[in-house]
């Protein structure tokens, strides 16, 4: 089953590109035709690229990776926040801070600062031990950090891949990802450079419906990857991996259980063998008794014979 249909792409306007005077010649191979001064993107190619990107994202997440959603333009902000939150992934939908990937250690300190500020009760002035002015300054700092870093609050390391809407607007994010060799999955409009993107999806990055549809597809891939990951984790809990060595205490426990089972089995076998050993002894005892009986019979017959002679 296809991830998305041609009809959905057409209804969302994914096929509309930019004006013919605003284009990147490298995108020529993805353009189907030109109509009324606007390029029309080849949706057959888009479908195949969507399937590839979907599989890549699913496999990345299934193997424990994370995908950062990036889209700061107005058309993408709502879809990015909604879909990333749905699948529990980090996102940036306001301003991209320079160094958010390449200088993540500093960004992480700011995230810790945000968590500290969230512990303060700004309504209770007396309990905080701060003046109203100090609380006001801290609340403004908290609001600023929440706006810029709220989407990546739970991120503890750089992501395994990034999903980007409009690579021209997010050129700083693309540059940082490429510098760290982080795979880039992105929508490519007719004015973008396809060489900057690892997993491209030719499409319209300006229409809200187009951006929402493609972002939802990537979020669905993440969701499927998470399901696969949880299934694999559940299977691993049930039984140890074949090549995984046991801990020393586990080995001792296992050997102790085996020894106990062996002793129990031997104890159960001994009573069963005893009757078998007694049976021949009983037969041996009965045999002489049986032989003695015929020997006694002639002795009993002898007096009878003497009486007849008398």
From Swiss-Prot:
GO CC, one annotated term: cytosolic small ribosomal subunit
UniProt-recorded Gene Ontology molecular function terms: structural constituent of ribosome
Keyword Transmembrane helix: no
InterPro entries from the UniProt entry: Ribosomal_uS2, Ribosomal_uS2_bac/mit/plastid, Ribosomal_uS2_CS, Ribosomal_uS2_flav_dom_sf
Start-end of Low complexity biased regions: 273-310
UniProt-annotated stretches for the region Disordered: 249-310
GO biological process, one term: translation
Keyword line: Ribonucleoprotein, Ribosomal protein
Pfam families assigned to the protein according to its UniProt record, in alphabetical order: Ribosomal_S2
Superkingdom of origin organism: Bacteria
Basic and acidic residues bias (residue ranges): 249-272
HAMAP family the UniProt entry points to: Ribosomal_uS2_B
Family: Belongs to the universal ribosomal protein uS2 family.
Protein name listed in UniProt: Small ribosomal subunit protein uS2
